[in-house]
């Protein structure tokens, strides 16, 4: 300030002293004013700067609130937008509220249906936990994030609902993990997360040597949840562990039984309700036995129990010391069941056609390879097999999880279920809405991959005809309760059903079940549909067996690839090749040795150049990576519950 004062005091030297004094005073006033103005300008400038900074921060905060990140979500926004786009995410529609099938139901059965559909939601809650212990916490997390307008969580939830869980494989066999850092566990949600197959085997060996026989029996059955118990493991029956939800299901089934118009279906509801209240596998057996007798009931209800996902339990089959110890204690390990809940309306016309095959099953049983070495469920005296065609209302839990696909039909109960030991049979349920197809898309597929002269023999309905043979062949052949095929058990069994269904096409034509035209359509359609987009993962039993069959049929001249890269089926070569493969499969099951099953799968699970040529074409035809199921009727029923 001193230099500034000096500068401001310089004046004309000709002025007198008085004037200089006045000017000096005035200069001081001016100085004060100028300083005040400068300070004011600085303050205003700082204020404006602060205002705009705060406004920018506020805008940034608003931006973050409208599109927040989802820290626990495993897929980026770009990938989520792609996978949830209709081009990549297909839709399967089940029965709608205005469907004639629903309208035709008796009012009492509609009332019963209300409680059955509600029961499905409780079972899905159980299966979420069996599938992965993190499913429900992650689902709740997504729902909380969606309430905060989190778009990433919203799109993730669409995929979660479609695949019914965090982890799944898409149609290109890519593993999809919706939660960040989360992977599929070998013991799914029924074993401790950190338990490996090797540790599992060591613990069981230790427990058996210490005579903890019953504990091991409980750990290795198909219906228990397993936990650590110090240096050991312990098990709790899932009916006991999920008692609250199972009781809710039982309560709903009891209510439904009060309204059901069909006496047999009502009896089944009561038996199933009883089985869900007490941890006793024999109660399930009585319910399953009754269920397997149901044919022309108005309503369809199945609690599905199948064991494809758990690889911890089946790992015992390649540990000879453990095998010997288990055999000495008469313990047969069975992989853990995953649970599903199917609800529908029985379609009479479709069921009529299905049941026509029943009379021919004893003849097919006679023609099974090595039939003199084992007993079969299907004999001349008794046919413990029935089947229904169902219009679907809801698929909850495991049966409704779209993980690279949803099954066209199911043949239950499986060999490990106790109902088969008390005279119970099996029942096939076929899914009408799942087998629906798009005619335009089918034609594009044929133009792309099938020799023009054979287009006439490709028919999507032939998939259904073939599936009838496939499902019934599950009931043919040896019933191996103590399967030692490990992770190859399901691959071998599904292969048996496929090759049996194909091998007996000629027999069923000669017996009058199929027409000659249907025979040709089944053969061509099955061979064409054996071509996949990509080589599947070994965990995908249904797809692995498809590659194996494709390779085997090619080696036996059942088809060729034309110069322009299209499939030509050598129709009359297919059935003999299928029967030869069926013979190999049955021998693997009868020998019941892990090493032979492994060798067999590795021998034929080969992705050839021909498969890649067709697979690449199929990828250009459809971009669909996953699909979701819409159940409008079920949603409406639940909204009015």
Residue ranges and their predicted role:
Residues 55-82:
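Ser/Thr/Pro/Gly-rich low-complexity linker/stalk segments immediately outside membranes or between
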Residues 73-272:
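N-terminal helix-rich structural modules
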Residues 76, 86-115, 215-481, 487-495, ...:
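Fold-level signature of zinc-dependent metallopeptidase catalytic domains
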């Amino acid at each position: 300030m001193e230099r500034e004062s000096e500068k401001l005091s310089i004046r004309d030297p000709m002025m007198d002293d008085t004037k200089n004094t006045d000017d000096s005073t005035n200069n001081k006033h001016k100085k004060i004013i100028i300083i005040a103005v400068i300070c004011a300008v600085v303050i205003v400038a700082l204020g404006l700067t602060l205002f705009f900074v705060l406004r920018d921060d506020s805008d940034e905060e608003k931006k973050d609130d409208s599109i927040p990140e989802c820290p626990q979500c495993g897929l980026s926004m770009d990938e989520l937008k792609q996978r949830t786009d209709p081009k990549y995410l297909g839709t399967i529609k089940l029965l709608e509220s205005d469907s004639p099938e629903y309208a035709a139901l008796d009012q009492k059965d509609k009332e019963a249906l209300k409680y059955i559909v509600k029961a499905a939601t409780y079972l899905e809650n159980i299966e979420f936990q069996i599938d992965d212990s993190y499913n429900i916490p992650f689902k709740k997390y997504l729902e909380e994030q969606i309430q905060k307008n989190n778009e990433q969580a919203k799109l993730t939830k669409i995929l979660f609902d479609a695949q019914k869980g965090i982890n799944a494989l898409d149609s290109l066999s890519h593993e999809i993990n919706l939660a960040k850092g989360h992977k599929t566990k070998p013991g799914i949600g029924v074993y401790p997360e950190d338990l490996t197959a090797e540790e599992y085997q060591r613990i069981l060996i230790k427990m058996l040597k210490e005579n903890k026989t019953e504990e091991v029996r409980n750990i290795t059955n198909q219906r228990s949840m397993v936990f650590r118990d110090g240096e050991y493991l312990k098990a709790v029956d899932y009916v006991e562990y999920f008692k609250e939800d199972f009781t809710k299901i039982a309560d709903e089934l009891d209510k439904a039984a009060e309204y059901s118009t069909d006496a047999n279906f009502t009896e089944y509801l009561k038996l199933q309700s009883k089985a869900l209240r007490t941890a006793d596998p024999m109660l399930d057996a009585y319910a399953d036995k009754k269920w397997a007798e149901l044919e022309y009931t108005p309503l369809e209800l199945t609690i599905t129990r199948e064991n494809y996902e758990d690889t911890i339990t089946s790992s015992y089959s390649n540990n000879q010391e453990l095998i010997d110890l288990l055999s000495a204690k008469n313990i047969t390990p069975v992989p853990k069941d995953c649970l599903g809940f199917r609800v529908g309306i029985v379609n009479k016309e479709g069921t009529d056609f299905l049941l026509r095959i029943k009379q021919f099953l004893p003849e097919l049983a006679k023609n099974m390879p090595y039939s003199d070495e084992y007993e079969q469920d299907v004999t001349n005296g008794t046919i413990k097999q029935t089947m229904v065609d169902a219009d679907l209302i809801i698929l909850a839990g495991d049966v409704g999880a779209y993980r690279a696909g949803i099954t066209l039909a199911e043949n239950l109960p499986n060999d490990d279920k106790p109902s088969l030991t008390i005279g119970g049979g099996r029942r096939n349920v076929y899914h009408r809405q799942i087998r629906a197809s798009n005619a335009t898309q089918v034609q594009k597929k044929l133009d792309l991959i099938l020799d023009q002269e054979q287009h006439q023999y490709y028919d999507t309905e032939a998939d259904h005809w073939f599936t009838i043979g496939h499902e019934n062949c599950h009931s043919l052949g040896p019933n191996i309760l103590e399967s030692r095929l490990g992770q190859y058990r399901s691959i071998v069994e599904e292969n048996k059903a496929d090759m049996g269904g194909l091998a007996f096409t000629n027999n069923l034509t000669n017996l009058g079940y199929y027409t000659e035209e249907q025979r040709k359509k089944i053969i061509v359609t099955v061979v064409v549909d054996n071509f996949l987009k990509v080589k599947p993962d070994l965990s995908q039993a249904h797809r692995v067996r498809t590659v194996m069959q494709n390779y085997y049929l090619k080696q036996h001249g059942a088809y060729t690839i034309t110069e322009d890269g299209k499939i030509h089926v050598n129709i009359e070569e297919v059935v003999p090749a299928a029967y030869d493969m069926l013979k190999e499969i049955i021998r693997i099951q009868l020998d019941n040795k892990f090493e032979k099953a492994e060798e067999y799968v590795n021998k034929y699970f080969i992705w050839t150049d021909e498969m890649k040529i067709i697979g690449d074409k199929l990828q250009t035809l459809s971009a669909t990576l996953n699909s979701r199921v819409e159940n409008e009727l079920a949603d409406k029923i639940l909204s009015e519950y």
